[in-house]
Amino acid sequence: MGRKSSKAKEKKQKRLEERAAMDAVCAKVDAANRLGDPLEAFPVFKKYDRNGLNVSIECKRVSGLEPATVDWAFDLTKTNMQTMYEQSEWGWKDREKREEMTDDRAWYLIAWENSSVPVAFSHFRFDVECGDEVLYCYEVQLESKVRRKGLGKFLIQILQLMANSTQMKKVMLTVFKHNHGAYQFFREALQFEIDDSSPSMSGCCGEDCSYEILSRRTKFGDSHHSHAGGHCGGCCH
């Protein structure tokens, strides 16, 4: 009986430790989501005036955006990405994409030209993935006239800064394999790695999947196993 009791205590202790670790993860995500403006700590990154561009950048929850700005972001995403989606197993569905982009957890970086014309944006969230606190980048979309001028890279650098300042472990994103320009951009220019949770790494569908999950660790990230033992998903909402 003594041996069984000892094993039971060890299991209970392990469960308590795992729960405490997950509570700590969720506390960091909740703290990040309570911020008024995650970009406030980096005023120098509120402007981008290189390569012929002069734009201002703001960070807001989706609830703080004007409906016209949300409509612009959706329309730009559809223009840039609908064909890519239709070439994947996901397909393109207006309603599902709009619901994703207007979810209460959505944050936005918006780049404005002349303080009035939106020209680029990133939709991101502070969330939990596979037991880790992460900043997940859902979209980075640019109008054609501002591409290839460093603005997209600048927006991703802002995400990395905010992920570090909020103690997230990594920045994550999903990219289609057939979107060769974006894949090369993230892997080579921004040094993102294929995440352990990506289908090609996890053994789930692998070559049959049209996408990869990429990530780049922050100074708070490490190579240890996640708290969730491989289960992917959010917990803080």
From Swiss-Prot:
According to the UniProt entry, what is the EC number of this protein? 2.3.1.257
Localization recorded for this chain is: Cytoplasm; Nucleus
Q: Write out the N-myristoyl glycine lipidation residues.
A: G2
Q: Where does substrate bind?
A: Y85, D127, V128, E129, Y138, T174, S197, Y211
Q: Which GO terms describe its biological process?
A: lipid metabolic process
Reactions accelerated catalytically:
N-terminal L-seryl-[histone H4] + acetyl-CoA = N-terminal N(alpha)-acetyl-L-seryl-[histone H4] + CoA + H(+); N-terminal L-seryl-[histone H2A] + acetyl-CoA = N-terminal N(alpha)-acetyl-L-seryl-[histone H2A] + CoA + H(+)
Q: List residue numbers at the site (Essential for catalytic activity).
A: E139
The UniProt keyword set, sorted, is:
Acyltransferase, Cytoplasm, Lipoprotein, Myristate, Nucleus, Transferase
Distribution of this protein across tissues and organs: Widely expressed; with the highest expression level in liver and the lowest expression in brain (at protein level).
Give the result of E139Q, as annotated: Abolished N-alpha-acetyltransferase activity
Impact of changing Y85A on the protein? Answer: Strongly reduced N-alpha-acetyltransferase activity
PROSITE patterns, from UniProt?
GNAT
Give residue ranges for domain N-acetyltransferase. Answer: 63-216
Binding residue positions for acetyl-CoA: V140, Q141, L142, R148, K149, G150, L151, G152, K153, N179
Q: Which Pfam families does this one have?
A: Acetyltransf_1 (PF00583)
Q: What is the effect of changing E100A?
A: 5 times reduced N-alpha-acetyltransferase activity
Which InterPro entries is this protein grouped with?
Acyl_CoA_acyltransferase, GNAT_dom, NAA40
- Gene Ontology MF, one: histone H2A acetyltransferase activity
List cellular component terms (GO).
Answer: centriolar satellite; cytosol; nucleoplasm; nucleus
Extract the Gene3D superfamilies matched here.
3.40.630.30
Q: What induces it?
A: Down-regulated in hepatocellular carcinoma tissues.
- The EC class name is transferase
Q: Which family does it belong to?
A: Belongs to the acetyltransferase family. NAA40 subfamily.
Q: What does this protein do?
A: N-alpha-acetyltransferase that specifically mediates the acetylation of the N-terminal residues of histones H4 and H2A. In contrast to other N-alpha-acetyltransferase, has a very specific selectivity for histones H4 and H2A N-terminus and specifically recognizes the 'Ser-Gly-Arg-Gly sequence'. Acts as a negative regulator of apoptosis. May play a role in hepatic lipid metabolism.
Protein name in UniProt: N-alpha-acetyltransferase 40
Encoding gene per record: NAA40
